[in-house]
Amino acid sequence: PGLGTVGIRNVKLTHAITGRAENIEGNPGNFTVKALKKPRYIDLEKCTSCGSCEEVCPISLPNAFEYGLVKRKAIYKPFPQAIPNAYVIDKEGDGKHRGCIDCMRCVKECKSGAINHDQKPEQLSLHVGAVIIAAGSPPFDPVIKPEFGYKKYKNVLTSVEFERVLSASGPTQGKI
Protein backbone atom coordinates (compact mmCIF):
# COMPACT_ATOMS: atom_id res chain seq x y z
CA PRO A 1 0.00 0.00 0.00
CA GLY A 2 1.05 3.59 -0.56
CA LEU A 3 1.83 5.97 2.29
CA GLY A 4 -1.56 7.64 1.77
CA THR A 5 -3.27 4.31 2.49
CA VAL A 6 -1.07 3.38 5.46
CA GLY A 7 -1.14 6.89 6.89
CA ILE A 8 2.01 8.86 7.62
CA ARG A 9 0.97 9.32 11.24
CA ASN A 10 1.13 5.56 11.85
CA VAL A 11 3.19 5.27 15.05
CA LYS A 12 5.21 2.36 13.66
CA LEU A 13 6.19 4.17 10.47
CA THR A 14 9.08 6.64 10.43
CA HIS A 15 9.88 8.56 7.29
CA ALA A 16 13.06 10.46 6.55
CA ILE A 17 12.18 11.64 3.06
CA THR A 18 14.99 14.19 2.92
CA GLY A 19 17.31 11.89 4.85
CA ARG A 20 20.34 9.91 3.83
CA ALA A 21 21.41 6.84 5.79
CA GLU A 22 25.04 7.20 6.81
CA ASN A 23 25.38 4.06 8.92
CA ILE A 24 23.21 1.00 9.55
CA GLU A 25 24.08 -1.49 12.29
CA GLY A 26 22.25 -4.39 13.85
CA ASN A 27 20.20 -7.36 12.80
CA PRO A 28 16.74 -7.89 11.32
CA GLY A 29 14.21 -6.67 13.85
CA ASN A 30 16.77 -4.50 15.67
CA PHE A 31 18.65 -1.94 13.58
CA THR A 32 20.20 1.38 14.54
CA VAL A 33 20.26 3.81 11.63
CA LYS A 34 22.32 6.99 11.73
CA ALA A 35 20.99 9.39 9.12
CA LEU A 36 21.47 12.98 8.04
CA LYS A 37 18.16 14.72 7.38
CA LYS A 38 18.45 17.67 5.01
CA PRO A 39 16.41 20.75 5.93
CA ARG A 40 13.12 21.43 4.12
CA TYR A 41 13.07 24.99 5.52
CA ILE A 42 9.38 24.38 6.27
CA ASP A 43 7.84 23.45 9.63
CA LEU A 44 5.69 20.44 8.76
CA GLU A 45 3.45 20.99 11.78
CA LYS A 46 2.62 24.55 10.69
CA CYS A 47 2.43 24.25 6.88
CA THR A 48 -1.19 24.17 5.69
CA SER A 49 -0.16 23.56 2.06
CA CYS A 50 -2.15 26.61 0.95
CA GLY A 51 0.38 27.52 -1.77
CA SER A 52 0.52 31.28 -1.09
CA CYS A 53 4.31 31.03 -0.63
CA GLU A 54 4.72 29.47 -4.06
CA GLU A 55 2.64 32.19 -5.73
CA VAL A 56 5.03 34.96 -4.65
CA CYS A 57 8.31 33.12 -5.34
CA PRO A 58 10.23 34.84 -8.17
CA ILE A 59 12.43 31.82 -9.04
CA SER A 60 11.44 29.23 -11.66
CA LEU A 61 13.22 25.93 -12.27
CA PRO A 62 12.46 22.88 -14.40
CA ASN A 63 10.11 20.56 -12.50
CA ALA A 64 12.01 17.27 -12.06
CA PHE A 65 8.84 15.35 -11.16
CA GLU A 66 7.38 16.37 -14.53
CA TYR A 67 10.73 15.57 -16.24
CA GLY A 68 11.32 19.23 -17.09
CA LEU A 69 8.14 19.53 -19.18
CA VAL A 70 6.98 22.45 -17.00
CA LYS A 71 8.51 24.83 -14.46
CA ARG A 72 8.18 24.96 -10.69
CA LYS A 73 9.15 27.59 -8.12
CA ALA A 74 12.08 27.41 -5.68
CA ILE A 75 9.45 26.81 -2.98
CA TYR A 76 7.20 23.99 -4.13
CA LYS A 77 5.25 20.86 -3.27
CA PRO A 78 7.17 17.95 -4.83
CA PHE A 79 4.03 16.52 -6.46
CA PRO A 80 0.25 16.80 -5.92
CA GLN A 81 -0.14 13.76 -3.61
CA ALA A 82 3.13 14.37 -1.72
CA ILE A 83 3.44 12.98 1.78
CA PRO A 84 3.92 14.94 3.87
CA ASN A 85 1.48 17.34 2.22
CA ALA A 86 3.78 20.33 2.62
CA TYR A 87 6.12 22.56 0.69
CA VAL A 88 9.92 22.45 0.54
CA ILE A 89 12.46 25.13 -0.40
CA ASP A 90 15.14 24.28 -2.96
CA LYS A 91 18.19 26.30 -1.91
CA GLU A 92 20.60 24.54 -4.28
CA GLY A 93 18.90 24.55 -7.68
CA ASP A 94 19.64 21.86 -10.24
CA GLY A 95 23.16 22.74 -11.38
CA LYS A 96 21.97 24.80 -14.36
CA HIS A 97 19.40 26.95 -12.55
CA ARG A 98 19.79 28.65 -9.20
CA GLY A 99 17.53 27.84 -6.29
CA CYS A 100 16.11 30.12 -3.60
CA ILE A 101 17.63 33.61 -3.47
CA ASP A 102 16.47 34.30 0.12
CA CYS A 103 14.26 37.22 -0.95
CA MET A 104 11.93 36.32 1.98
CA ARG A 105 8.73 37.03 0.00
CA CYS A 106 7.47 33.59 1.04
CA VAL A 107 8.08 34.37 4.73
CA LYS A 108 6.02 37.56 4.47
CA GLU A 109 3.22 35.72 2.63
CA CYS A 110 2.99 32.65 4.90
CA LYS A 111 0.13 33.25 7.36
CA SER A 112 0.96 30.18 9.47
CA GLY A 113 4.63 31.08 10.06
CA ALA A 114 5.80 27.74 8.65
CA ILE A 115 8.88 28.99 6.80
CA ASN A 116 12.29 28.91 8.50
CA HIS A 117 15.21 29.76 6.22
CA ASP A 118 17.62 29.03 9.10
CA GLN A 119 16.73 25.34 9.46
CA LYS A 120 19.87 23.19 9.71
CA PRO A 121 20.61 19.57 8.77
CA GLU A 122 19.67 17.18 11.55
CA GLN A 123 21.49 14.04 12.73
CA LEU A 124 19.01 11.24 13.38
CA SER A 125 19.52 8.03 15.32
CA LEU A 126 16.63 5.69 14.62
CA HIS A 127 15.97 2.33 16.26
CA VAL A 128 13.99 0.31 13.74
CA GLY A 129 12.92 -3.23 12.97
CA ALA A 130 13.36 -2.94 9.21
CA VAL A 131 14.97 -0.60 6.71
CA ILE A 132 13.54 0.16 3.27
CA ILE A 133 16.16 1.63 1.00
CA ALA A 134 14.80 3.36 -2.10
CA ALA A 135 17.89 4.42 -3.99
CA GLY A 136 16.26 5.07 -7.34
CA SER A 137 18.16 5.25 -10.60
CA PRO A 138 18.48 7.93 -13.23
CA PRO A 139 16.30 7.55 -16.33
CA PHE A 140 17.86 6.95 -19.74
CA ASP A 141 19.14 10.15 -21.36
CA PRO A 142 17.97 10.03 -25.01
CA VAL A 143 20.17 12.99 -25.95
CA ILE A 144 23.06 10.51 -26.32
CA LYS A 145 21.15 8.90 -29.22
CA PRO A 146 20.71 11.79 -31.71
CA GLU A 147 18.98 9.49 -34.23
CA PHE A 148 15.89 9.59 -31.96
CA GLY A 149 15.49 13.35 -32.58
CA TYR A 150 14.98 14.04 -28.87
CA LYS A 151 15.14 17.81 -28.16
CA LYS A 152 15.39 18.35 -31.94
CA TYR A 153 11.69 17.67 -32.57
CA LYS A 154 9.09 19.08 -30.20
CA ASN A 155 6.88 15.99 -30.12
CA VAL A 156 9.58 13.41 -29.35
CA LEU A 157 9.18 12.33 -25.72
CA THR A 158 10.63 9.61 -23.52
CA SER A 159 8.25 7.00 -22.13
CA VAL A 160 8.26 8.61 -18.67
CA GLU A 161 7.62 12.08 -20.14
CA PHE A 162 4.72 10.63 -22.13
CA GLU A 163 3.42 9.02 -18.94
CA ARG A 164 3.42 12.45 -17.24
CA VAL A 165 1.63 14.02 -20.25
CA LEU A 166 -1.08 11.33 -20.05
CA SER A 167 -1.48 11.62 -16.27
CA ALA A 168 -4.53 13.46 -14.94
CA SER A 169 -2.20 15.13 -12.42
CA GLY A 170 0.47 15.88 -15.05
CA PRO A 171 1.36 19.11 -16.85
CA THR A 172 -1.50 18.77 -19.38
CA GLN A 173 -4.03 17.19 -16.97
CA GLY A 174 -4.09 14.21 -19.36
CA LYS A 175 -5.10 16.22 -22.43
CA ILE A 176 -3.08 15.60 -25.58
Predicted regions span which residues?
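Central beta-strand plus flanking loop segment that forms part of the substrate or channel wall
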Residues: 154-167
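Short, intrinsically disordered, charge-balanced linker/junction segments flanking boundaries
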Residues: 173-176
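Short, conserved active-site loop motifs that form the nucleotide-linked donor/cofactor pocket
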Residues: 11-14
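Non-heme iron-sulfur electron-transfer modules
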Residues: 1-4, 16-46, 58-108, 112-133, ...
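N-terminal structural subdomain of ketosynthase/condensing enzymes
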Residues: 169-171
